[in-house]
Regions:
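Preference for solvent-exposed, low-hydrophobicity sequence contexts
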Residues: 1-153, 160
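Extracellular/virion structural assembly segments
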Residues: 137-292
Length: 292
């Protein structure tokens, strides 16, 4: 059988037909281009599979190329030898070997400096050792010169959830990592508590709990980004690295409210909007308990 590459449902990085990802439009309505922002290579880590009738596959080529609707005759921007592919093998119901792979970069995209706004895709070529090659390109990315008004999102779960077969992987850490045009804002410190009133009218705190909660502000996103963002926030382990370099990585839990603000465009259809949600920092709990 030919070698095939596939990303998982609900992944921000896909090997789908680029024509329906680079331009997120419909047959009627407004047209918008959406490319995932990337500041350096550490902003991208994704999972995918390689299926073949052999147990051997190897990466023959990895390049960053100009964004096009297809992978044919690309203009190579640079080859990146620092990319790392790791994986484990399994067998599907038809006896084919399935390689569960992770792709990530341990170093920055230094070659992209000075290319502010350039759109590009990641192009990979794999060989099964018998001159059966497969070439695939991802959806598009856009280089940004700084991290302002963006946030790196990192998420994983120990079990299979929402289209991600995490149990197939045996890596030490199987993170999905992506950078999105959103940022943390307006921290609040909601408090819950219980009190009782003495006979003389004074009040005594029985229990008080204070948490830190962020509102998230975002730029426009296509519908499939917002769907995948909601799924990412539903994972067991979710971390955000805000654009503020003074802040460190924060583990968060999303509240149950995730809404989308759609643009007011009359009868014109649009499949982009802005997600509205809040994140609770964890662990961040200040407790006063006089009940014990």
């Amino acid at each position: 059988m030919p070698v095939t590459l596939a990303t998982f449902e609900n992944s921000f990085v896909t090997f789908d037909d680029q024509s329906n990802k680079f331009v997120s439009d419909r047959s009627c309505g407004y047209q918008r281009d959406f490319c995932i922002p990337v500041y350096d290579g550490t902003d991208v880590s994704f999972l995918f599979t390689i299926t073949a009738d052999r147990t051997y596959v190897s990466p023959e080529d990895f390049t960053t190329v100009n964004a096009r609707p297809t992978c044919e005759q690309p203009t190579i921007m640079f080859s990146n030898p620092t990319v790392i592919f790791t994986g484990v093998t399994s067998t599907d119901g038809d006896g084919n070997t399935v390689h569960y792979m992770k792709c990530y970069w341990p170093t920055p995209f230094t070659e992209l400096q000075g290319r502010h706004g350039d759109c590009f895709v990641l192009r990979v070529v794999f060989d099964d050792g018998d001159e059966n090659f497969v070439t695939a390109c991802t959806n598009c990315f856009s280089y940004i010169p700084d991290k302002c008004f963006t946030t790196q999102l990192k998420y994983m779960s120990p079990d299979d959830i929402m289209g991600f077969p995490y149990s197939k992987y045996r890596f030490e850490v199987d993170w999905n990592i992506i950078r999105l045009p959103m940022w943390l804002s307006k921290p609040q410190y909601p408090k819950t508590g219980e009190y009782y009133e003495r006979s003389n009218g004074t009040k005594q705190t029985l229990f008080a709990r204070i948490e830190r909660q962020y509102s998230v502000i975002s730029d426009d996103m296509p519908e499939w980004w917002m769907k995948n963002l909601n799924i990412a926030l539903s994972h067991d382990d979710v971390y955000v690295l805000p654009e503020d370099t003074a802040m460190s990585e924060i583990k968060v839990v999303a509240t149950n409210d995730f809404e989308i603000q759609w643009p007011e465009m009359g009868t014109n259809a649009a499949n982009w909007g802005r997600p509205v949600f809040e994140l609770l920092e964890t662990p961040f709990v200040e407790i006063n308990n006089n009940c014990s």
